[in-house]
């Protein structure tokens, strides 16, 4: 039962967690847009949910998606207060792929 309460408390703070990610993206100097997608954007979170964050980057950012994901999460945790065990999933896409996806999903834009 403790895990359920702990996880729900984390999930209720999803806006702060996403803000930490957006601030990390900004502090890394990335020209990127950040959106919340999935259950949080559609208002259907459950105790087993994670928070899906879409980061739309330029093709010229010069870093692969796995390395970029690592850099963003590390910066968000080390400098912007994202808990290390927060249930967040980063989806890194180039802008042209994002444009197609954004047309079909409910999204919440996030500003740093």
Go through each PLM region and give its residues.
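Catalytic core of pol beta-like nucleotidyltransferases
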Residues: 1-36, 41-48, 57-112
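Structural signature of the urease/amidohydrolase superfamily beta/alpha-barrel
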Residues: 52-53
């Amino acid at each position: 039962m403790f895990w359920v309460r702990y996880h729900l408390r984390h999930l209720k703070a999803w806006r702060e967690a996403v803000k930490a990610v957006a601030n990390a993206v900004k502090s890394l100097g990335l020209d990127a847009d950040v959106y919340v997608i999935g259950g949080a954007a559609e208002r259907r979170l459950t105790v087993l949910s994670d928070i899906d964050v879409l980061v739309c980057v330029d093709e010229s950012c010069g870093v692969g998606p796995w390395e970029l994901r690592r850099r963003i999460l590390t910066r968000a945790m080390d400098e912007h207060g994202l808990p290390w065990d927060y249930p967040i999933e980063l989806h890194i896409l180039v802008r042209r792929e994002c444009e197609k996806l954004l047309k079909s999903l409910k999204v919440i834009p996030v500003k740093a």
